[in-house]
Every structure is written in C-alpha cells, then in structure tokens.
Amino acid sequence: MTTVTPSAGRELSNPPSDGISNLRFSNNSDHLLVSSWDKRVRLYDVSTNSLKGEFLHGGAVLDCCFHDDFSGFSVGADYKVRRIVFNVGKEDILGTHDKAVRCVEYSYAAGQVITGSWDKTVKCWDPRGASGPERTQVGTYLQPERVYSMSLVGHRLVVATAGRHVNIYDLRNMSQPEQRRESSLKYQTRCVRCYPNGTGYALSSVEGRVAMEFFDLSEAAQAKKYAFKCHRKSEAGRDIVYPVNSIAFHPIYGTFATGGCDGFVNIWDGNNKKRLYQYSKYPTSISALSFSRDGQLLAVASSYTFEEGEKSQEPEAIFVRSVNEIEVKPKPKVYPNPAA
C-alpha cells in the first residue's frame, strides 16, 4: 500500500452553497451533474471549469443522473421526479412519490428512469411519454423499508433500504425481486454500487465497513464474498469509526474508491483484497465520488454530512483530480518461486 500526499485536485468554481448530495460524470464527456441541499441541480464542464447551467427546485435535491450530455433527471425533498434539459433550460415533472425521493437511476438497457423513495417504493418511469404520471409511470414496487441507495448494471437493479434490506431485481420482470437479502453488515447501509462486470455489488455502512457481495447464489460464488474495515482511526486507545458515504468503481480496471466522513478517499483492489492508494485528507466529509468515463478523472465532493450534528464546517467544495494509473491499476499477484 502506498500513501502519498498529492494535491487535492482542481477545485471547481461556483460550487453549491449547501450539502452536496451526489455528483456524476457523463458517459460521453467531462460534464459533471451535481445535486445539492441548496435546492439546485448544476451542470459543470470540468474541462473548462465552467458552470453550464442550473435548475432551482422546491426542496433539497437528493440525487441526479444523466440521460445524455445536456439532460438528466433529478429527485428530492419536494417528492417530485423531474427531467431537466440544460441546453434549452426546460424541465418537466415525470411524476411524484408520497415522500422525499432519495435515489434516481436511468437504465439505458430498459429506457426507463427508476426512483427510490422514503415512501417505501421504487417506481419506474418511461421518459418518452408526455409529462404526467398517468403517461409516464410504468410501475410501482413496494419495498420493505425506506430506500437509501440504488445501483444498476445491465438489466439488474439493486435496492438497499433502511432495516438493512437488499432487494435485487431484473428490470425485465419487476413484479418480484429476483433475490431478497439482508446486508451482511450489522449497521445501517449508506451506499450500494454494482460491479462494472455485473457479477455483484459493494455495500457500505455507517460503521466504517464495506461488504463485497455476489449475485450468483452457488456455494462457490458465495464463498468469495467478504467484508472489510475502512475509514477508521485509533485515538487514545479507542477506535474511531466513520460512515462510508460513497463508492465509485473505476470503469477500466474495476478497482474502486471509497469516501468517508473522515475526509479520506481510498482506492481498493477488491479482487486482491488490498488498498492501493490513499489520497491526502480533504477539508471535510466526502459525500460523493465519481470517475469519468475513461477513468482518468475522479470528482470528489467535500461536504459535511452532519454525522456530528451542527458545528462550524468547511464550505462545500468539488475537487477534480487527475488519476494516475499506479493509483487504480491492480498489482499482479506475486507467487513465491517453487523450491528448486
């Protein structure tokens, strides 16, 4: 494991003025979509460090995702699911939930928007229909508890809820979950992200741990699952444990970054169970992470997540760092030479 202290990365100008709930790179460019508790969704062009546009909503914006380079979807505390188009400054409401909407994903495979809410439902929407739920809503799927995090890979959807429940769906048949699971971690789930190769997912908790899980229920596949501790420190003989807020997979190598309330970003090689890198400490909690489509940039949201209640805090900031291959490329396993 290598620890160095490179710069935090380039800081974007015009950052949000309140907590950053998520940020995501486009699949086609260096555009970055950012949702925030200041009721705004912002689109940045990272290559020119410029704000391309923003929308003001009726409440805190809790998540956002891209549709294409200049449009996407946003959800939040005002219960609404919106399509937002930046190059023409237009938004429409696809529909609503009964409580705050925590998560949104767009499935390119299914052509649907998927939302997860604190009303204990997941809803699917067809954005090609005209505005309004009667024309765009595809289905509503009851969950055991409030939805905290979701992730997609291909036709698979993983939904993590309060109460440590995990439901795994096939988007082609949403009537029942393919699998109903319980988190293998003892404490509340903070983030779930699918492996880019589609074989499973990583799940993080408020108690400084990440679990590596596999979809295949065979004994051989399940024997590969494990969990590890991270984002902790020892102080005066006590272990101080921090929530792991964010997980982001590298699109080329399948290694992944975690961001915690300790202000650190770590890079992990999940297959070899090793930490590859730790970046120097950021000003405050890491609330969100995203790799660019080619894996050469990592966007880091440094934004206090109120794990210690009200206190004086560093201002919200978005850093974009260049990623060196040595930080994210798995190291080959070294086998001892057989005795002569």
From Swiss-Prot:
Keyword Nucleus carried by entry: yes
Function: Has a dual function in spindle-assembly checkpoint signaling and in promoting the establishment of correct kinetochore-microtubule (K-MT) attachments. Promotes the formation of stable end-on bipolar attachments. Necessary for kinetochore localization of BUB1. The BUB1/BUB3 complex plays a role in the inhibition of anaphase-promoting complex or cyclosome (APC/C) when spindle-assembly checkpoint is activated and inhibits the ubiquitin ligase activity of APC/C by phosphorylating its activator CDC20. Essential for gametophyte development.
Tissues expressing this chain: Expressed in actively dividing tissues, early in organ development, in young leaves, lateral root primordia and root meristems, flower buds, flowers and siliques.
Record-stated family: Belongs to the WD repeat BUB3 family.
UniProt keywords, alphabetically: Cell cycle, Cell division, Centromere, Chromosome, Chromosome partition, Cytoplasm, Cytoskeleton, Kinetochore, Meiosis, Mitosis, Nucleus, Repeat, WD repeat
GO CC field: Cul4-RING E3 ubiquitin ligase complex; kinetochore; kinetochore microtubule; nucleus; phragmoplast; spindle microtubule
One of the protein's GO biological processes: mitotic spindle assembly checkpoint signaling
Per-repeat ranges for WD: 15-54, 96-135, 142-179, 239-278, 281-324
Protein name as catalogued: Mitotic checkpoint protein BUB3.1
Subunit structure: Part of the mitotic checkpoint complex (MCC); interacts with CDC20-1 and CDC20-2. Interacts with MAD2 and BUBR1.
Subcellular localization: Nucleus; Chromosome, Centromere, Kinetochore; Cytoplasm, Cytoskeleton, Phragmoplast; Cytoplasm, Cytoskeleton, Spindle
Gene designation per UniProt: BUB3.1
Pfam families for this protein: WD40 (PF00400)
Phenotype of the disrupted gene, per the record: Survives only in heterozygous state. Displays defects in development of male and female gametophytes.
Region listing for Disordered, in residue ranges: 1-20
Induction behaviour: Cell cycle regulated expression with a distinct expression peak at the G2/M boundary.
UniProt-listed InterPro entries: G-protein_beta_WD-40_rep, WD40/YVTN_repeat-like_dom_sf, WD40_repeat_dom_sf, WD40_rpt
